[in-house]
Each structure stands twice: as C-alpha cells, then as structure tokens.
Amino acid sequence: MKFNLGSLNKQKKLREMLIYCFLETTAWWLIISRFTGANPLSSLTTRTVSLMTFSLISAFLIAFIMDTNFSSNLILPIGIIGLIPIILDIEKLTFPIFGLLLLLIIGLFASCIPQLQLQNYFGLLTISLLVVAVVPITIYYGQYHYFPNALFTSFIAFWFLTAFFLEPYFTKKTQSISITSIVLLGATVVAIFFLSHIFLAFVSVILLLVSWYAKPLLLKSHWWLIIFGILQIIISFAL
C-alpha cells in the first residue's frame, strides 16, 4: 500500500488552519467577554454577525499565510472576501472601525510582499500586535462605542504569546534553542504571571514550556498553531 505523503501533509495543514480559525476567533471574543463580564454575542445584530464573519475569515487568513509560507496567490482574494461583510454593514460599524479592520488585512497582505521586507523581527512584532488587538478592539468599540485603556494591559501577554508562536514563520528558525525564541518565551512567561488567575497562569506556562520544547515536532506535524489557539483561550480565562 502506498501513501501519498503530499496529500497527507495538505490534510494536516487544512486541519491546522480550520481548528486554529475556530480557536483564534473564540479567543478574540472571549477576551472581550472576560474583560467586560458580559457576552458580546448576547444580541445577534447585523453588526455582530459582520464582525463574527470577519473574525473567522481573518483567523483563517492568518493560518493560511503561515502554512503557505507567505507565498500563495489566494491570500489577497481571501482578505477581500473577509472585508465584504464589513463593507456591506459599514454604516453600522462606523468608518474608524472599518479602517482598523482594513489595517489588519493590509498588514497581513503587506507581510507577504518580499519588497517590503516584513518577514523579520519588525514584521513579527507589528503583525503580532495587529493580530492580537484589532478584532478585540473593534468588538469592544462596536458594543460600547468607546475603548478603555485598561484593555491594552491585557493585550501584553497575548502580544508576546503571538510573537512567540509566529516567530518560526517570520524568522524561519524552527529549532527550540534560539535567542529570539528564548527571549520571547521569557517575556511571555513574565507577562502571563501578571494575570489575575494564578492557577491558570501556571497551567499556561507549563503548556507553553512543553510547546517550546516540542517546537520542531509540533511545527512538522502541523499542531503548532492549534496549541497557540488553545493557549490563548486558557490565558483568556486567566484575565
């Protein structure tokens, strides 16, 4: 019996992208739910549906860009599709929110243009910040029409965590022992312990350390982004 390794690898990539898409979207909305103590999905308005649709497509786009090594011709079409529900509901979302969401898509697309040279440490930190902040900010602003500065503090742990997990895609360093990986790991661990729920902080750190140790295997087996999504949800509950 012959196994088509190429087909098997594509299936693993698709599995990783779809699961991460669900986990990332859940984490984005959970951050706001935990911060406010309210369910942002309690009232299903057209604005909520538009933001949820954008969240799902954006999360898929992030995983798609990473798993295709920033080089697929489908990146721009997927980004445009993600903006369609926002454009159709732009009157209810307001122009500033549309501009912020557009910034995420532009940032992701720009990271794929070799001439811009964003596949480096600057690009890593910039894209990680956009991935962490844009959707939660728009969800909160869309619900309450203002944005509290205190929410930025909760983004710090997620920013370092995102940079840690996206680092191998931007730097092409898949080994666990590298200066960048260790620095981001240390920064993430410190930021996590500033969260309010100590037990979940410990659980997050243990899973993070195991992920760091098994980094080459998780990347090769396409579990890396899935672990990333799971960790975000755990840390969301620690807020």
Question: Positions of the model-derived regions?
Answer:
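Short, aromatic-rich membrane-interface segments at the entry and exit
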Residues: 42-43, 72-74, 93-101, 119-123, ...
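Alpha-helical transmembrane segments and their membrane-interface exit regions
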Residues: 50-61, 102-114, 131-133, 154-166, ...
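Interhelical loop and helix-boundary elements at the membrane-water interface
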Residues: 5-19, 63-76, 110-129, 170-183, ...
